[in-house]
Amino acid sequence: MAGRVEGKVAFITGAARGQGRSHAVRLAQEGADIIAIDVCKRISSNEDIPAPTPDDLAETADLVKNLNRRIVTAEVDVRDYDALKAAVDSGVEQLGKLDIIVANAGIGNGGQTLDHTSEADWTDMIDVNLSGVWKSVKAAVPHILQGGRGGSIILTSSVGGLKAYPH
């Protein structure tokens, strides 16, 4: 029995681990090939979780390959539109098309309240969590439109968008 996305290609940001890895593995289980990117380094000094690494991204690739699906990976910062576009273009060239965008990359501020968040940390969060999503979709959506088959765009967010942090 074919999976729900059999033969499709998905572009996933923040794919080295966590939700991004989970999306890559699940979509591969359902039959998709994957274009996976991650910055693979710390962006903000105030983040409270360890930074993703190139080894993390390689592990995601191995998990997808073990499902007999193809995967193209790149270390890319979603704040860098030109690098995003180059990674998506390369992935589409290798895999033939694009059907799904999962803009998942994001950072936190270590749980700091607004009055303790530095301007630099705020700028990093906006540049990754908002502008990075727009840049990711902008870099990828022309391939979906060019395919003429329709497609899906999935944008993830923080639980902070649903429930305020205490303090």
Regions found by a protein language model. Give the residues of each.
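Canonical Rossmann dinucleotide-binding motif of NAD(H)/NADP(H)-dependent dehydrogenases/reductases
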Residues: 3-35, 39
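Conserved glycine-rich Rossmann-like NAD(P)H-binding loop of the short-chain dehydrogenase/reductase
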Residues: 30-59
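The beta1-alpha1 cofactor-binding region of Rossmann-like NAD(H)/NADP(H)-dependent oxidoreductases
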Residues: 54-55, 75-87, 119
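A glycine-rich helix->loop->beta "capping" turn
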Residues: 67-70, 90-101, 110, 149
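Substrate-binding pocket helix/loop in short-chain dehydrogenase/reductase
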Residues: 112-114, 121-126
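A short, exposed helix-loop element centered on a Lys and neighboring polar residues
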Residues: 137-138
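Residue(s) in the substrate-gating loop at a strand-loop-helix junction
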Residues: 158
